[in-house]
């Protein structure tokens, strides 16, 4: 189920994004990006609709994923 990220408090949203970024592992690109940069990137993706915040009833977890990969 998609959760409207706009309904979350800014602190809650930042904490969810930070947790997601930290779970994602190591960057293998040419330039290392800071945690703040990664959080800002994910926030931009949510704002643009490219990514969505998803609640899994089965696992009782929240995740962020590309909208094109989300299936009801």
Curated annotation (Swiss-Prot):
Gene3D superfamilies listed in its UniProt record: YehU-like
SUPFAM superfamilies for the chain: YehU-like
Superkingdom of this protein's organism: Bacteria
InterPro entries hit by this protein: UPF0270 (IPR010648), YehU-like_sf (IPR036685)
Protein family (similarity comment): Belongs to the UPF0270 family.
Name the UniProt record assigns to this protein: UPF0270 protein YheU
Taxonomic source organism: Salmonella arizonae (strain ATCC BAA-731 / CDC346-86 / RSK2980)
Gene (UniProt): yheU
